[in-house]
């Protein structure tokens, strides 16, 4: 009977090890996904800042043109 208990325990340990290995793989995948999303976010932030600068430049040019029209 103790052999049966040892077999059951061994099976549960194997299942636990398999579960841990699967979870480790999932963690690695999630870390990679997180890194990719972080890079994408950083790229979008840079693009956003660039667009803000372009918008400011456009507004300044527009104000300048409107000022020239007012002077005419």
UniProtKB/Swiss-Prot annotation:
The keyword Cell cycle applies. Keywords: Cell cycle, Cell division, Coiled coil, Cytoplasm, Septation. Residues 3-71 form a coiled coil. The keyword Cell inner membrane does not apply. Belongs to the ZapB family. HAMAP family: ZapB. Non-essential, abundant cell division factor that is required for proper Z-ring formation. It is recruited early to the divisome by direct interaction with FtsZ, stimulating Z-ring assembly and thereby promoting cell division earlier in the cell cycle. Its recruitment to the Z-ring requires functional FtsA or ZipA. Homodimer. The ends of the coiled-coil dimer bind to each other, forming polymers. Interacts with FtsZ. This is Cell division protein ZapB.
